[in-house]
Amino acid sequence: MSSSILEALEVPLSDLLRRNLAPVDVAILDSGIDATHPMLSGRVVEAFGVTKTDGQDTIVAVAQDTDNDQIGHGTAVGSIIARIAPNARLFDVRVLGADNTCSDEILAAGIRHGTAKGWAVINLSLAAGYRLRGDLEAVCEAAYYRGQALIAARRNIPVGGDGLPAELPSCIGVDLGSYQAPFEFGFLIGSPIELIAGGEGIVVAARGGGFKTVTGTSFATPAISGLCALLLGAFPDLQPYELKSILRSRALIGNQKKA
């Protein structure tokens, strides 16, 4: 066991904010980010859009200081990470369209792009269907072995499962619980979805300015991504399995999931 994880297991998570944290690259695969919002101004390093052009999934770079959001979902998610982890460098990958959906192929293309870029933490506040399970397993496992942490949301309404990639062992799956984000969270025993974080009544940045209140697994997930960014900022050599161990050791005991 490395000295980093031994220290990380002892330090209260809230104390990490008092440290000189290294910058950590955090990708947000979502509806885009409104980088003109005061809460997110200067936080987005690069921005992309993933679309289907002539039958091919195409990844296009866009200006990182503009409104790249389609519906406001990604802006909300990004603001949670930005608030929790001041050391997070945000990378915006827009995969959702104006109808808040995307094809499994576009989502898979976004995940492949994120893992190929080598971003340390990848937040996925969305879920794919099961048709591409084999492809997603291969991509997520490769990222895991490269030391990348993929944090993914459980489906708010499960349809035959918890959703991909959240239920894959190479990811950290997150469900919605009745906790005070971000430093209180639970561990779900006997489930592929490992953590339960506070995602109810969360005040987030609204696209176009101002703030709004949201609820859902989508907003519990970035709380865990933010904590991973804090841990990696303090202990850059931590591996995904060590992040899982640290988070489990700090989780409240029991299946404290909100009904």
PLM region descriptions:
Residues 2-84, 88:
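Active-site core segment of subtilase-fold serine proteases
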Residues 34, 50-51, 96, 180, ...:
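Active-site/binding-pocket entry motifs
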Residues 15-21, 101-123, 133-148, 159-175, ...:
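Mature extracellular/periplasmic domains of secretome proteins
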Residues 60-130, 234-235, 247-251:
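Subtilisin-like peptidase catalytic core
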Residues 1-13, 115, 119-124, 233-259:
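C-terminal subdomain of the subtilisin-like protease fold in secreted/lumenal serine endopeptidases
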Residues 163-233, 237:
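Extracellular S/T/G-rich loop segment that most often corresponds to the catalytic His/Ser-adjacent loop
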Residues 94, 123-127, 151-155, 176, ...:
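A cross-family glycoside hydrolase active-site/sugar-binding cleft signature
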Residues 66-75, 157-158, 212-224:
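Gly/Ser-rich catalytic serine loop of serine hydrolases
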